[in-house]
């Protein structure tokens, strides 16, 4: 809803143009009516306008926030300590909207891991618990998910990207011998993350189920991608599926596909 298309800047703008405050409220009302009880979104300062309108319209959908230092202030530094501090500040700002959970951003987690500072996440988890919300940790890398499980930082849930979008060029060279033009969406990623998700004992919210629209060429392709996700995660897990209902009723379409997958 805030223009994260994972396609290009033009498509980001296309989404932002359509998703006015009133449309965001309307879509979330439609979600709630269709049986979707939780909205997950990255922290955005526009929420200070949107949430009063949303609650004023009688929508009680739950909110899970994805926090990152750059969402709080894009000018903040990117050292591990600065990312931790900024993400905690982001989580504190998000508490205004009464989230049921706040997750540490996947790119931020992956940054800490590369820097050998993954233990800083324990501080984040403790701070979010002190705020009164469930604490989550997101990642794009199945190896990091396994490490988090071993470390046992006390978080309540994970967010797990089915595509490893935080690879560095050297990672691509080591794995595939080349570097992609875009973020890098490859078919071998989802099974690896799904396998890691099945090995952790906490709930995981799995995202990039439709590969940011790359598995939306047909209704059958979408249906198969959603079914595959549910067939390969734990019963206590759930999916995060982005919608952009500009041209069709994606709320109804997606909820129907999820119900079919779970039937």
Located regions from the model:
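Hydrophobic faces of well-ordered beta-strands that scaffold small-molecule active sites
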Residues: 1-4, 39-41, 61-66, 100-104, ...
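Active-site beta->alpha loop and helix N-cap motifs at the rims of alpha/beta catalytic domains
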Residues: 10-116
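Structured C-terminal cap/extension of enzyme domains
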Residues: 11-16, 21-31, 35-40, 56, ...
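Alpha-helix-loop-beta-strand connector modules within alpha/beta enzyme cores
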Residues: 21-26, 47-73, 118-133, 185-206, ...
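Catalytic beta/alpha-barrel core
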Residues: 39-43, 101-116, 134-141, 159-164, ...
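Glycine-enriched alpha-helix->loop->beta-strand junction motifs that scaffold or abut catalytic
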Residues: 57-60, 98-99, 129-131, 150-159, ...
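Glycine-rich phosphate-binding active-site loops on the catalytic face of alpha/beta enzymes
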Residues: 108, 157-168, 232-247
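Histidine/lysine/aspartate-rich catalytic loop segments that bind and position anionic ligands
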Residues: 149-180, 184
């Amino acid at each position: 809803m805030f223009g994260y298309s994972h396609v290009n800047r033009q498509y980001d703008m296309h989404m932002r143009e359509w998703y006015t405050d009133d449309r965001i409220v309307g879509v979330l009302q439609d979600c709630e009516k269709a049986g979707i009880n939780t909205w997950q979104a990255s922290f955005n300062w526009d929420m200070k306008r949107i949430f009063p309108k949303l609650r004023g319209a009688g929508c009680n959908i739950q909110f899970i926030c994805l926090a990152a230092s750059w969402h709080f202030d894009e000018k903040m530094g990117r050292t591990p300590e600065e990312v931790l501090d900024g993400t905690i500040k982001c989580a504190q700002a998000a508490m205004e909207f009464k989230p049921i959970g706040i997750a540490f951003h996947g790119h931020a987690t992956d940054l800490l891991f590369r820097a050998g500072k993954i233990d800083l996440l324990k501080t984040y988890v403790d701070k979010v618990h002190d705020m009164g919300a469930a604490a989550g940790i997101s990642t794009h890398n199945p190896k990091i998910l396994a490490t988090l499980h071993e470390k046992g930082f006390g978080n309540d849930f994970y967010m797990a990207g089915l595509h490893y979008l935080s690879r560095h060029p050297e990672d691509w060279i080591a794995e595939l011998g080349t570097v992609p033009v875009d973020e890098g969406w490859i078919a071998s990623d989802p099974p690896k993350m799904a396998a890691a998700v099945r090995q952790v004992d906490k709930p995981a919210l799995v995202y990039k189920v439709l590969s940011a629209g790359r598995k939306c060429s047909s209704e059958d392709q979408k249906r198969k991608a959603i079914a595959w996700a549910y067939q390969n995660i734990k019963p206590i897990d759930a999916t995060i599926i982005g919608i952009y209902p500009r041209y069709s009723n994606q709320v109804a379409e997606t909820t129907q596909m999820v119900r079919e997958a779970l039937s």
